[in-house]
Structure formats: C-alpha cells, structure tokens
Regions:
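Bacterial N-terminal signal peptides that target proteins for export
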Residues: 5-19
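Bacterial N-terminal signal peptides
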Residues: 20-28
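Lipid interaction determinants
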Residues: 29-84, 91-137
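Generic short amphipathic/hydrophobic targeting helices enriched at N-termini
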Residues: 9-11, 23, 32
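Intrinsically disordered, low-complexity peptide-like regions
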Residues: 12-15, 30, 86
C-alpha cells in the first residue's frame, strides 16, 4: 500500500510541475501579446514611401504615402483621391486630409502580434498591411 501512495505522489508531483510550467508559458505569451502604440518615428518608418492596404468601412483600399507629404488612396471600386499626410510628433498621431475635409483626420497606429491597426476615438481598430514601395493596384 505504501508503494502505491508513493507512486501516486510522484505522478501528482510531475503533473503539478507540468501544469505550473504550462501556466507560466501561458502568462508569458500574454505578456508578449500586448498591443503597442507606435511612436511618431515608428509611424514614419513604416509609412514613408510605402503603401498601406486593408479594408475601411468594408471597402478594400491601397494608400500610398509619399515622402513629400502627398498620399494617394485607391479603392477596389476604382475611386481615387489625392490628399496630404503628416505626423503630429507631440501626440504621436498619423494625420491625413483630403479635398473636402475641413480638419485633419487623426489616427493612432498600433501594433499587435506583428500586425498594424489604425485606431481612433470613434472607430474600432482597423487592420492594415504594409507593402514596401508604391503598390496601388
């Protein structure tokens, strides 16, 4: 009988240690999966001279960000618009303005699990991908 209880105790100890390791790995993975708000320098690095592509309000788009502050957006339906973009270094926000806009539209850029998101106070996070260079079509 003593032999059985020692054997069970040993198995219990192994299972307990294994569960602890699994829990520790789970907690560590959660810590690494936190969203990060990009700085103005990081926003500039990913956008400047590159194209963002994704879906905005259900419409597929490609938007190029030229180093001179010009931005071109082309949607899947063929709609094309040329505007301006810049970065507010104090608030670390991306800003854009298109013909007809009264004010600059501001968005935060977030990174979560190596994916980028546009984030504002009024819209849910919207995922986008970066294409290197000018890739509007």
């Amino acid at each position: 009988m003593l032999f059985l209880s020692r054997k069970f105790g040993y198995k219990f100890m192994i299972i307990r240690n294994l569960l602890f390791i699994v829990f520790a790995l789970f907690v560590a993975s959660l810590a690494n999966a936190q969203s990060v708000k990009l700085t103005s320098i990081q926003i500039s690095e990913i956008l400047n001279g590159n194209t963002a592509s994704g879906k905005w309000d259900g419409e597929v788009y490609n938007q190029y960000f030229d180093a001179d502050g010009t931005t071109i957006i082309i949607k899947a339906d063929g709609f094309e618009n040329i505007g301006k973009w810049k970065i507010n270094h104090e608030t670390e926000e991306f800003l854009s303005k298109f013909p007809g806009d009264i004010d600059w539209q501001s968005l935060y850029v977030m990174e979560y699990l190596s994916e980028f998101y546009w984030v504002s106070k009024t819209t849910p996070p919207t995922k986008f991908k970066i294409k290197i260079g000018k890739k509007l079509k």
